[in-house]
Amino acid sequence: MAGTGLLALRTLPGPSWVRGSGPSVLSRLQDAAVVRPGFLSTAEEETLSRELEPELRRRRYEYDHWDAAIHGFRETEKSRWSEASRAILQRVQAAAFGPGQTLLSSVHVLDLEARGYIKPHVDSIKFCGATIAGLSLLSPSVMRLVHTQEPGEWLELLLEPGSLYILRGSARYDFSHEILRDEESFFGERRIPRGRRISVICRSLPEGMGPGESGQPPPAC
C-alpha cells in the first residue's frame, strides 16, 4: 500500500503531505486529518528540543507499552513550560482547537528511538477528547490511518520536522493510526528515512472529565 506510489493525491500546492486510497477518503478526512508543514521555525524546534532533552534523557527507552501499541519509546507528561515554549503551545491551541474546547492541562511528550514505531491503534475516548494536535521534532515520519471497518480506505500523512498534525473526530475514532517503522517508511515511492522522533501532543479534554483530572495517557502519535 505505502510503497506502490500508484496514487499520490495532493491537498496542497507543491510537495504533497497527504495521500490516500481515493478521492472519497480524502474528502471525508479533509478537515479531520490535517498537516501543516513548517508550522515551527528552526529556532522554535530548537527551543522545544532543548527544553525536553534533559527530562527525556533521565528516562530509558521502553519496548513494552501498557497496551502494546508502542515499541522503542520513552514518554512523559509535562505541564510546566518556559515562556517561549508556552507561546508555541498557544499557537497550537489556536490552530487546532475550537473556542469551546478545553485542553488537558498536561502535554504528552513521546520520544521514539530510530528503530521505534507505533502500531495501529484507535485512541480511547477515556483519555482524550475529540481532537489531538502534535508537533513533530527531529526526524520525518509517515503516519498511516486505516479505516477500522473498510481496510481498503486509508490515508497517509508525511510529518516533517517542524510540522503540525491535527486529528479530529472520524480520523481518530473510525480509523486506526500508526507511525511506520524505518524499514516500512515510504510515502508513495519516496523513502522517508526514520531517525529519532519527538512528538509534542496537545489533547482536548475527554467528555465528562474536569480540567484538573488526568488518567493513563493514550498511545498518541
Swiss-Prot record:
Transit peptide, UniProt annotation: 1-20
Gene Ontology terms describing biological process: DNA damage response; fatty acid metabolic process; regulation of lipid storage; regulation of mitochondrial membrane permeability involved in programmed necrotic cell death
Oligomeric form and interacting partners: Monomer.
Example of a GO MF term: metal ion binding
Needed cofactors: Fe(2+)
Main subcellular location: mitochondrion
Binding site for 2-oxoglutarate: Y165, R197, I198, S199, R203
CC cofactor note: Binds 1 Fe(2+) ion per subunit.
Tissue-level expression: Widely expressed, with highest expression in pancreas, followed by spleen, prostate, ovary and placenta.
Organism: Homo sapiens
InterPro entries, sorted: AlkB-like (IPR027450), AlkB-like_sf (IPR037151), ALKBH7-like (IPR032870)
Its EC number(s): 1.14.11.-
Identification of the protein by name: Alpha-ketoglutarate-dependent dioxygenase alkB homolog 7, mitochondrial
Family that this chain belongs to: Belongs to the alkB family.
Compartment(s) where it occurs, according to its Swiss-Prot or TrEMBL record: Mitochondrion matrix
Effect of L110Q: Does not affect ability to trigger programmed necrosis
Top-rank taxon, per record: Eukaryota
